């Protein structure tokens, strides 16, 4: 059977991935449209309130030309931008209802996401290929995901 030349990004997909994210220990789940070796990563990231995304930045090729783009398709997300010392430089409210639906940030920008509504769905776009060992550079001073310290951090 030949694979379909298109993939729907619809409410049924949102509901399916959101249900899985609610059951996942991290309270979030990616649904990839790309293969790891693709030049462009394209995926849904579904976040539930209470998930902890350790502040990080991406340094894919060291050229400084990289980016990460977020577009909220359902729900609302808080995006926090940090400097290298871990101080919050900017807080943004991204929502499917607007007025700000998305943002593009440059590589080397430390950031984290906070789910402000249940079943929040964002479409993410960034350069590939995906290299798990090099994908994220975590900001010092913040706990690892899955620890009791992370749970306390998220509660704040």
Q: What is the predicted role of each segment?
A:
Residues 1-44, 92-95:
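A short, N-terminal "cap"/entry segment at the start of jelly-roll beta-barrel domains
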Residues 43-45, 62-72, 103, 113-114:
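His/acidic/aromatic-lined binding-pocket segments of jelly-roll/cupin-type domains
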